[in-house]
Amino acid sequence: MLTVDAKGVFPIAPTPFLADGAIDMSSVDRMIDHYVAAGADGCTILGIMGEAPKLDQDEAIGFVARCVARAPKLPFIVGVSAPGFAAMRSLSHAAMAKGAAGVMIAPPPSLRTDDQIVTYYAQAVEAIGSDIPFVIQDYPLTLGVIMTPNVIRRIITDNASSVMLKHED
C-alpha cells in the first residue's frame, strides 16, 4: 500500500492503443519493462494523460491487471476520477483488488470554491473508503480548478488516507 513515505520517480504512463481502439497489451508490457529498467520507483496509470476517459470499466481494470502482473513489485497508482462517486468507488475497489498501491483523484472542473474542493475530497474518501490511500491530482491548466496550499493542507489534514500530491503546471 502507498504511504506518506513513498518517494522517488513515479512516471505517468500513457495507455497505448491499437488502430481499432483496443488497448495494445504488447506495448503495455514493453512500456512497463522500460519503466522498470529505467529505475522507476512506482508508476501512475489511468491519469489524464493515460486516456482513462476513453476506457470502459472492464478495459480500465484489464489495463491495471496487466500492468501489475508485468511488474508486481512496482507500486502502481491508478487514476479513478469519474463523473460520479459510484464509478469511482467501483474502479478504486477493483484496482486495489488487482494489486494497485493506491488511487489518484482529480477534482471535477465544476468546483470553484475552497469549501467545494475540500468537501469533494471528503465525499470521494467516503465513497471509496478511508482504507484506500489516495493521491490528490492538482492539474489547474487542464481542470480549471485552483487548489491553494491552504486547500491542499485542509484535504490532507481532514483525510488520513491522503498520502501524496501530484501537482502539475
What are these regions (language model features)?
Residues 2-146:
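Active-site beta->alpha loop and helix N-cap motifs at the rims of alpha/beta catalytic domains
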Residues 30, 149-154:
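A generic local structural motif
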Residues 152-169:
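Active-site/ligand-binding-proximal alpha/beta "capping" segment
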